[in-house]
């Protein structure tokens, strides 16, 4: 907008220069006075230089009413704002503010308590828009004003041509008459009346006067000055040049207005694009923030719901298990009672029939009783076997949990009571009896924490690895010096990264054992350690024994569990 105004001012200055140049043609030249010669000083006398003037006294600081009012207003604003802010922190000050009913205290306190930087920015933008939203003339208004100026300029040119042409046509002067006519003509006194026709000035309509730019107003003013100069001058012989200059000025003004309109439209489009981009970026930012907040809330609610559902599900599962076990035991008891009742009822009916039939069909009754006894024995055997299965399964599960995966906080417990319980139950099955017989010497004297876990075996193997490295470097029949040298050189061995399947050196064996233990393949690790030879095999013998003991216990417990399922 500033560029458009400066350009329009330059255009108006050019138009005014044309009008002023036309006026200067009738102005008489100024008389320049001759230069005055400088005074001549006499050579014989010397005048002393005057003393320097005294320094001016310091000016007293004038009283400024505007500064006094500004400082007073600023101090009152700070005191008032500080009082309202203190009212939000102190109840006594709040009571004072409410009692005195300070102006706008409710709105300002609400703004201090609930206001934010975004609200202040929004209020500042609204205030800024009120001052910056100035109504500018549209393109249609500018085009309409340009057309009116062109038509008005054409009318002025036509009227100027008419008035200039009318000055040429007049009465014949005395020189146009013949000498005889001049002698015969009497002396006449003619009163000369000079009628000066004034050209119409350019005026704007009242509805366009408010929306027209200041540059256009200055241009119209220069046009009016030019018309007045035409009225005051007698430039009849230079009408063509004047008309040409007017036409060129009007054309330049029209082209300038068109260029200004285009520049204004382009700048407006650029500002609209920039504002649209800023709004889109702010909208995208707000959308991302809302999405992140919603996702965070969703994940939190999801975790809470999952925890509640898992807790509820575990409680329901435990309750269902207890209900199912109780229902099963009740069903078995009810079946036994029902069978006993049916049996007694059947026996009583048969006895009554025999009594009524005088002990007739005694053999049929005996056969029926035998069948009932077989059925009762088979049903009882099935119930006993199912009970044994359940007891064996519980005992094996308990042994596995105690031996193979003991809890760190549990106290050591003896294993013999569980073995005795299995021995009592498995008297009828040969496979179970043999498995329990082989398992008894392994864990009879052991506790729940004496069998090493995979993690403990891995830790012991890592502690044993330096000794194995030093032992692998011992020469045959090594003495004290050989042992010391092997210890020193074992420190220089670099650990092997990865697993070498075909490596027979001690580092490859150590790496394969550690990898197998990390994967839970204890049998492969024990096999690798058992294949060691020499002094290394003797050092690893205790570890191999513990690993084999764990493998044997795992195998026997798995065998007992599998056999209990097929009883």
From Swiss-Prot:
Coiled coil: 284-383
InterPro entries reported in the protein's UniProt record: MIC60
Topology term for the membrane: Single-pass membrane protein
Ranges annotated as spanning the membrane: 65-87
Pfam short name (any one): Mitofilin
Annotated keywords: Coiled coil, Membrane, Mitochondrion, Mitochondrion inner membrane, Transit peptide, Transmembrane, Transmembrane helix
Family indicated by similarity: Belongs to the MICOS complex subunit Mic60 family.
Function: Component of the MICOS complex, a large protein complex of the mitochondrial inner membrane that plays crucial roles in the maintenance of crista junctions, inner membrane architecture, and formation of contact sites to the outer membrane. Plays a role in keeping cristae membranes connected to the inner boundary membrane. Also promotes protein import via the mitochondrial intermembrane space assembly (MIA) pathway.
Assembly and interaction partners: Component of the mitochondrial contact site and cristae organizing system (MICOS) complex.
Protein name according to UniProt: MICOS complex subunit MIC60
Native organism: Candida albicans (strain SC5314 / ATCC MYA-2876) (Yeast)
